[in-house]
UniProtKB/Swiss-Prot annotation:
GO terms for biological process: clathrin-dependent endocytosis; intracellular protein transport; negative regulation of hyaluronan biosynthetic process; positive regulation of neuron projection development; positive regulation of receptor-mediated endocytosis; postsynaptic neurotransmitter receptor internalization; synaptic vesicle endocytosis; vesicle-mediated transport. Residues 614-702 are annotated as: Disordered. Residues 666-675 have a biased composition (Pro residues). The keyword Protein transport applies. The modification Phosphoserine is found at residues 626, 652, 655. It is found in: Cell membrane; Membrane, Coated pit. Signal peptide: none annotated. This is AP-2 complex subunit alpha-1. Keywords: Cell membrane, Coated pit, Endocytosis, Membrane, Phosphoprotein, Protein transport, Transport.
Length: 977
C-alpha cells in the first residue's frame, strides 16, 4: 500500500473537524454543519471545475457529516468520479464513500460496477485490492451477481500478487456467506485447495477461512484439502520444520493459522488414508506434548496462543472420537486446567470435558475429576463457570456416582443463582429417575427438589413422580408417609401440596392405621393449606376430598360440610363451583358401591417416556449439545437406565387433577422378563430354549418395562403411531453402499455416533439394549437449505432375518425442511441368534431428483450381551464344557491400532462382555464372559484375548454353545483391535 505523502493532508478537513469538536451545544454543531453543507453544495454546482484534491476533501467532509448522524443527499456523483482517478488517495476516498453511503438501489450502481470492473481488469494490485474491499464491504446480492464469476478467476490466477489473492479470498468468502447460490463451483475449486501450500501467511490464512466455509456445504468438492491441511499443520507444529517460522507470535508459530487448520479438519471424519491419519495423530500428540512443557514466556499472549491451539486440538480429538489414547490424554490435560487461576481456562476445560464425558473411551477418565468439579460448583465466583460445572456433573453421572452427584446438586441448589435453578432442577429430576434403584430415594429426591426450589419445579417433574408412584406398589406407602410428613412443615410450597393431595387421595389409606396420620388428621392437614393455594391446586384438593369420602367414610360429614359451604357452592371460579356442586351431589345420592366404582384407585399409567428431558433441551436451547452427545453406554452397570434418557413421547402425561376424577383405565404393563444373574450360567450353555418366568418388576428392572415387547395382538406401547410402516422387500432396494461394513464396524463397541454423512444428509444413531430388547433412535439431518420431499426411511430384513429379529419402526414426516432434523424410533426384539444386520433404506427427493441409499443398521448380535461375573473355577469348568471343535472360534491377527491395555478393556466392555479378574495366569491377557439373550434361547459365551506387544499381534478365542455364533462374534471383535 503506497504511503500518503505530506502534501496529501487535507487542512480544510482538519479545521472543520476541529470546529465541530469545539461546538458548545447541539444547535451550534448543526449551524456549523449547515454552513459547511452550503459551501460544499456551492462548490459542486459552481462553474469552476474542481480538481481531484478538492473533490476528495469535500467528499471526506460529507462522509464525516454522515458519520455524525446527518443525512447526505448530494455528492454521490463526485464520489463516483473519484473512482476513475489514477491517484491512490483519491480512489481510496471514493471507494470509502461508496462503501458507506451508497445502497444497492442507487441509480449510480451501474457506474460504480463499471469502475470496479475496470479496476479488477487493471494489473495494478493496489487498485484491485481497493475494488475487492469495496465488493466485500457492500456485500449485496447485486454485487455478487456482478462479480461472483470474476473473483474466483483472480484468486487462482498464477500472476496475481499475494495481497490480491488474500483480498480475493476474503471477498469471495463474504459473497458466499451472503448469497451462496451466486458463487459457482467449478475448476477453480480444485485449485483453491492448493493455496493451503502457499508460503504467504495472509494468503493461506484467508484460503483456510474460505475453504472451511465452502466445504461445509460442498464437502466432496474439497475433500482433497484434508491431506494438504494435515501436511501444513504438521510442518507448523513440528519443531524440525521451518515452515512459517517467521510468523511466530510469542514463541508460538502461526497460532491463528494452526487454529483455522484444526477447525477445517473438524468438517470431515477421520482421514481414510493410513499415512495421513498417522501424520495427523502425530501432530495432535505433539500439541498435547507441548502443552506439558514449561512456558517459554510469562506473558499472557504466549499462554493465550498456546492454549488456543490446545483447545482446538482437543475439539478435533473429540470430533473424531476414534483415538482412545488421545481422548484420555485430552481429558487429563483438561483436568489440569480445572484448577487453573485463569477463569476462562477453567470455563473452557469444563465445557470440553462435558463433551468428553459422552465418549465411551474417556467417560471413566472424566469421572476421576469428580471431586474437583464438585468443589468448583461450590466455590466458583463466576456463575457461568458454576453452570458449566453442573453441566459436567450431569454428563459424567452414571450408576456408580448418581447418589453423590444428585446430593451435591441438591446442596448447590439451595444457593444457586435464580437464572439456572430451573435447569438444575430438571437435571436432578432426570438423574434421579434415570439411576433410581431404590425408589424411596427417588421420592425423597423429588420432594427435596420441591422443598428447596419449589418455584422452579415444572409440571413435568411432579407429574412424573406421580406417574412412577402410581405404577409401583412397593413405593406407594412410603410416598404417602413422606408427603404427609412434608406437608406438616409450616411453610409448604404449593407444588408440595399438589403432590401430597394426589398421593394421599390415592394411597392415604396405606398410612391411615397410624393414629398420627389417621383420616381426619390427613384431611385437616390438607385443608389447612386449601385457602393459601391457587385455583388449580384447590380444584385438585377438592378431587382429593371426594376420594377421601370413598376411602374413609368417617370423614364424609366433615367433607360434605366443606363442599356445602357458600364459599364453594357460590365460588366466583366456575371450575371450583362446578366441582363442589357435583362432588357434593355424588357423595349424597350415590350408593357405596357406585361411589367405590366411580372413585376407585387410578390404574397404572401406560409406560411412556419421560418428558423431563425435552423440557431440559428446550431450556438449553437449540445451541445445546446435540441429541447424539449425551448418549453413551454405561459400562459400569448392567441396566439400561445407565444409557441416555429417551427422547420424550409426543403424548403428554395426564394432568393429576384430571386423574383424580378417573381417566380411562389403561391396562397395566406386562411384567418384564426375569433378571439374568450369574447363577443362571449353568443353564445357558446349551442349545435348548430357556423359559422366562413372568415375575413382577424389581427395582433393579425399573426401566426395563419401557422396552417390554408388545402383546401379540397389540402394537408396541412405546410408539405413538400404532401402525408400523410397511417395509419394502430386499429386492426393492439397492445394495448397501461400499463403505457400509466399515460404518457398521464403528458401532460394534459403541452405541452412539454419526452413522452416515454426505453433503445432503447426516444420519445419527443412539441406542440402548437390555436383555433381548433394544431401542434405537435415528436422527436424520437435512444439511441443505432445500426441503427433502417424499422422505421415507425403512428397515428391511434380508433373508431369514425376519424370523430372527423383530424391528418395529415409527413413521417420520414425509418432508424435512432445510437445516432441520427428524427422529425415528425403532423398537427391537431379538428372537433368535442372527448373523446379518438389518438394512436401512433411505429414499427422498432433493431438488426434484430422487435420492436413495442403503446402509447396514448397527444392530449386531453382541448388542444383546448380558455381562456375567464368575469365579476362576467356574470359568474353567464352563470352558471345558465348551470343548467341541465347532463351539470354538479362534483368530490370530495383527494389531491395527496401538496396543493399549485401557483401550482394549474399554472395547471389550463396550462389546458387552464382563471382564473377569484373576482368572488367566498371565495378567496381560483379558478374559470375559456373557450371555446372549434372545427370546427363544440364551447362548453363553466365554472369551480370551491374548495380546503380544512385541509382535504387535493378538490371539482371540471364543467359545459358545452355537458354532455360527462363535465364528460371528470372533469376526466382529477381531476387527476392533
Amino acid at each position: 500500500m503506497p504511503a500518503v505523502s505530506k502534501g496529501d493532508g487535507m487542512r480544510g478537513l482538519a479545521v472543520f473537524i476541529s470546529d465541530i469538536r469545539n461546538c458548545k451545544s447541539k444547535e451550534a454543531e448543526i449551524k456549523r454543519i449547515n454552513k459547511e453543507l452550503a459551501n460544499i453544495r456551492s462548490k459542486f454546482k459552481g462553474d469552476k471545475a474542481l480538481d481531484g484534491y478538492s473533490k476528495k476533501k469535500y467528499v471526506c467532509k460529507l462522509l464525516f457529516i454522515f458519520l455524525l448522524g446527518h443525512d447526505i443527499d448530494f455528492g454521490h456523483m463526485e464520489a463516483v468520479n473519484l473512482l476513475s482517478s489514477n491517484k491512490y488517495t483519491e480512489k481510496q476516498i471514493g471507494y470509502l464513500f461508496i462503501s458507506v453511503l451508497v445502497n444497492s438501489n442507487s441509480e449510480l450502481i451501474r457506474l460504480i460496477n463499471n469502475a470496479i470492473k475496470n479496476d479488477l481488469a487493471s494489473r495494478n494490485p493496489t487498485f484491485m485490492c481497493l475494488a475487492l474491499h469495496c465488493i466485500a464491504n457492500v456485500g449485496s446480492r447485486e454485487m455478487g451477481e456482478a462479480f461472483a464469476a470474476d473473483i474466483p478467476r483472480i484468486l487462482v490466477a498464477g500472476d496475481s500478487m499475494d495481497s490480491v489473492k488474500q483480498s480475493a479470498a476474503l471477498c469471495l468468502l463474504r459473497l458466499y456467506k451472503a448469497s451462496p447460490d451466486l458463487v459457482p463451483m467449478g475448476e477453480w475449486t480444485a485449485r483453491v485447495v492448493h493455496l493451503l501450500n502457499d508460503q504467504h501467511m495472509g494468503v493461506v490464512t484467508a484460503a483456510v477461512s474460505l475453504i472451511t466455509c465452502l466445504c461445509k456445504k460442498n464437502p466432496d468438492d474439497f475433500k482433497t484439502c484434508i491431506s494438504l491441511a494435515v501436511s501444513r499443520l504438521s510442518r507448523i507444529v513440528s519443531s524440525a520444520s521451518t515452515d512459517l517460522q517467521d510468523y511466530t507470535y510469542y514463541f508460538v508459530p502461526a497460532p491463528w493459522l494452526s487454529v483455522k487448520l484444526l477447525r477445517l479438519l473438524q468438517c470431515y471424519p477421520p482421514p481414510e488414508d493410513a499415512a495421513v491419519k498417522g501424520r495427523l495423530v502425530e501432530c495432535l500428540e505433539t500439541v498435547l506434548n507441548k502443552a506439558q512443557e514449561p512456558p517459554k514466556s510469562k506473558k499472557v499472549q504466549h499462554s493465550n496462543a498456546k492454549n488456543a491451539i490446545l483447545f482446538e486440538t482437543i475439539s478435533l480429538i473429540i470430533h473424531y472420537d476414534s483415538e482412545p489414547n488421545l481422548l484420555v490424554r485430552a481429558c487429563n490435560q483438561l483436568g489440569q486446567f480445572l484448577q487453573h487461576r485463569e477463569t476462562n481456562l477453567r470455563y473452557l476445560a469444563l465445557e470440553s470435558m462435558c463433551t468428553l464425558a459422552s465418549s465411551e473411551f474417556s467417560h471413566e477418565a472424566v469421572k476421576t475429576h469428580i471431586d474437583t468439579v464438585i468443589n468448583a460448583l461450590k466455590t466458583e465466583r463466576d456463575v457461568s463457570v458454576r453452570q458449566r460445572a453442573a453441566d459436567l456433573l450431569y454428563a459424567m453421572c452414571d450408576r456408580s456416582n448418581a447418589k453423590q452427584i444428585v446430593s451435591e446438586m441438591l446442596r448447590y441448589l439451595e444457593t444457586a443463582d435464580y437464572a439456572i435453578r430451573e435447569e438444575i432442577v430438571l437435571k436432578v429430576a432426570i438423574l434421579a429417575e434415570k439411576y433410581a434403584v431404590d425408589y424411596s430415594w427417588y421420592v425423597d429426591t423429588i420432594l427435596n427438589l420441591i422443598r428447596i426450589a419449589g418455584d422452579y419445579v415444572s409440571e413435568e417433574v411432579w407429574y412424573r413422580v406421580l406417574q412412577i408412584v402410581t405404577n409401583r406398589d412397593d413405593v406407594q406407602g412410603y410416598a404417602a408417609k413422606t408427603v404427609f410428613e412434608a406437608l406438616q412443615a409450616p411453610a409448604c410450597h404449593e407444588n408440595m401440596v399438589k403432590v401430597g393431595g394426589y398421593i394421599l387421595g390415592e394411597f392415604g389409606n396405606l398410612i391411615a392405621g397410624d393414629p398420627r396420620s389417621s383420616p381426619p388428621v390427613q384431611f385437616s392437614l390438607l385443608h389447612s393449606k386449601f385457602h393459601l393455594c391457587s385455583v388449580a391446586t384447590r380444584a385438585l384438593l377438592l378431587s382429593t376430598y371426594i376420594k377421601f369420602i370413598n376411602l374413609f367414610p368417617e370423614t364424609k360429614a366433615t367433607i360434605q360440610g366443606v363442599l356445602r359451604a357458600g364459599s364453594q357452592l357460590r365460588n366466583a371460579d366456575v371450575e371450583l363451583q362446578q366441582r363442589a356442586v357435583e362432588y357434593l351431589t355424588l357423595s349424597s345420592v350415590a350408593s357405596t358401591d357406585v361411589l367405590a366404582t366411580v372413585l376407585e384407585e387410578m390404574p397404572p399409567f401406560p409406560e411412556r417416556e419421560s418428558s423431563i428431558l425435552a423440557k431440559l433441551k428446550r431450556k438449553k436451547g437449540p445451541g445445546a449439545a446435540s441429541a447424539l452427545d449425551d448418549s453413551r453406554r454405561d459400562t459400569s452397570s448392567n441396566d439400561i437406565n445407565g444409557g441416555v434418557e429417551p427422547t420424550p413421547s409426543t403424548v403428554s402425561t395426564p394432568s393429576p387433577s384430571a386423574d383424580l376424577l378417573g381417566l380411562r383405565a389403561a391396562p397395566p404393563p406386562a411384567a418384564p422378563p426375569a433378571p439374568v444373574g450369574g447363577n443362571l450360567l449353568v443353564d445357558v450353555f446349551s442349545d435348548g430354549p430357556t423359559a422366562q418366568p413372568s415375575l413382577g418388576p424389581t427395582p433393579e428392572e425399573a426401566f426395563l418395562s419401557e422396552l417390554e415387547p408388545p402383546a401379540p395382538e397389540s402394537p408396541m406401547a412405546l410408539l405413538a403411531d400404532p401402525a408400523p410402516a410397511a417395509d419394502p422387500g430386499p429386492e426393492d432396494i439397492g445394495p448397501p453402499i461400499p463403505e457400509a461394513d466399515e460404518l457398521l464396524n464403528k458401532f460394534v463397541c459403541k452405541n452412539s455416533g454419526v452413522l452416515f454423512e454426505n453433503q445432503l444428509l447426516q444420519i445419527g444413531v443412539k441406542s440402548e439394549f437390555r436383555q433381548n430388547l433394544g431401542r434405537m433412535y435415528l436422527f436424520y439431518g437435512n444439511k441443505t437449505s432445500v426441503q427433502f420431499q417424499n422422505f421415507l426411511p425403512t428397515v428391511v430384513h434380508p433373508g431369514d432375518l425376519q424370523t430372527q429379529l423383530a424391528v418395529q419402526t415409527k413413521r417420520v414426516a414425509a418432508q424435512v425442511d432445510g437445516g432441520a432434523q427428524v427422529q425415528q424410533v425403532l423398537n427391537i426384539e431379538c428372537l433368535r441368534d442372527f448373523l446379518t444386520p438389518p438394512l436401512l433404506s433411505v429414499r427422498f427427493r432433493y431438488g426434484g431428483t430422487a435420492q436413495s441409499l442403503t446402509l447396514k443398521l448397527p444392530v449386531t448380535i453382541n448388542k444383546f450381551f448380558q455381562p456375567t461375573e464368575m469365579a476362576a473355577q467356574d470359568f474353567f469348568q464352563r470352558w471345558k464344557q465348551l470343548s467341541l471343535p465347532l463351539q470354538e472360534a479362534q483368530k490370530i491377527f495383527k494389531a491395527n491400532h496401538p496396543m493399549d491395555a485401557e483401550v482394549t478393556k474399554a472395547k471389550l466392555l463396550g462389546f458387552g462382555s464382563a471382564l473377569l479378574d484373576n482368572v488367566d495366569p498371565n495378567p496381560e491377557n483379558f478374559v470375559g464372559a456373557g450371555i446372549i439373550q434372545t427370546k427363544a434361547l440364551q447362548v453363553g459365551c466365554l472369551l480370551r484375548l491374548e495380546p503380544n506387544a512385541q509382535a504387535q499381534m493378538y490371539r482371540l478365542t471364543l467359545r459358545t454353545s452355537k458354532e455360527p455364533v462363535s465364528r460371528h462374534l470372533c469376526e466382529l471383535l477381531a476387527q476392533q483391535f
